[in-house]
Amino acid sequence: MANLIKLRKGLDINLKGKAAAEVVAVKEPGFYTLCPDDFTGVTPKVVVKEQEYVMAGGPLFVDKNHPEVKFVSPVSGVVTSVERGARRKVMSITVQAATEQDFEEFGKKSVAALDGAAVKEMLLNAGLFAFIRQRPYDVVADPTVAPRAIFVSAFDTNPLAPEFELALSGEEANFQTGLDALAKIAKTYLSISVNQKSPALTQAKNVEVTVFDGLHPAGNVGVQINHIAPVNKGETVWTIDPQAVVFIGRLFNTGHVDFTRTVAVTGSEVLKPAYVKLKVGALLTGVFENNVTKDKALRYISGNVLTGKQISANGYLGAFHSQLTVIPEGSDVHEMLGWIMPRFNDFSTSRSYFSWMMGKKKEYVLDARVKGGERHMIMSNEYDHVLPMDILPEYLIKAIIAGDIDRMEALGIYEVAPEDFALCEFVCSSKMELQRIVRDGLDMLRREMC
């Protein structure tokens, strides 16, 4: 029987605009873009030229430090642009999809007949290794370092998060094959929600299943690692999102890559929130067109409101994202008395407004305003109330700001990723950019230690 872990700390932010449990058709996008910045820790080296034809699964760029780690095209077509920024930094590579799709063939493989080294080689050749991240540092995994374990979180507790069970429908065999492949490399842990009932999750084979019950961030893989098998200095673990596990299963079962995700289109400004099928890097114009509020300043996000990336209405789906969100920008809002005005429709963790009297099921419409400037850091334990990890978050943040590596190590920086502090950032009365601070701290530590 699966182990049950109940979390008492956390906070659910109930927003308006949850996706209906249906998959709607959208016009196939004509362009796909990969951004190296989506793959944290990678120094890209472009291996294609503009106007060159690539097949789906063909490499677009590799990691300079580990050339065996390839980042491949999700579709076949012509490379229309290689965009560079300051100091020739590679910003993005765009491919115009061909009418007829051609695939790099990697050959169907029986996972049972392979060992861990052969599985890893297959993932590297097909570009799927790029979707595996490692702790410490929360970067694309180093293929030369053997992981102690691999963690998969099969549920998401972020605001308006997609239901993985809907995405899993019809992909059960591919998901199990993906788990089988990962289990060949290292012991694999699968974390599921107490509300998930799919046999593909509750009865998954070759993995250790753990059931979590709690508020957000219970779905964060970092929180799960902290409660199952914490990361110590000198240890490495891998993490991978569940839809990328499906990618792996498709590779072994079909012999070619298929980066199609089931994506939730959410947010208070989406007219018909629902699910769509999109490949990684897809142009999103057709998704938002005639499906968002008009005559209003909007914030488009690839991902969720806490950890997602701001994009334009003509942006692209992020490599690791299975959610799109549209909320009001808030730049055109003028409120009498500002934030001190009594109200029933604004969310507050400290009951500053009367909205808490409306019950936990009330759906809120929140905009992108910070509503305040950065202030001195207040040691009020407000982070502790929403972070169910065995660390001292406020002291860790102070150690990162001070650049004290010894203190950072002692306070648990090897276990965390920026997303683990997203909720802390939301409730922070000092308005500090905690995710950026943690990212800077991890980068500094990696430069010193690697």
What are these regions (language model features)?
Residues 1-47, 62, 212:
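N-terminal, Lys/Arg-enriched amphipathic/low-complexity engagement segments
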Residues 31, 51-54, 149-151:
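Active-site-adjacent bridging/hinge elements
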Residues 42, 48, 65-68, 272:
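Short, solvent-exposed loop/turn positions at domain surfaces
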Residues 48-62, 81:
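Short, well-structured beta-strand-loop connectors
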Residues 68-76:
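Short coil-to-beta-strand transition motifs
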Residues 69, 83-450:
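Buried, small/hydrophobic-residue-enriched core segments of structured protein domains
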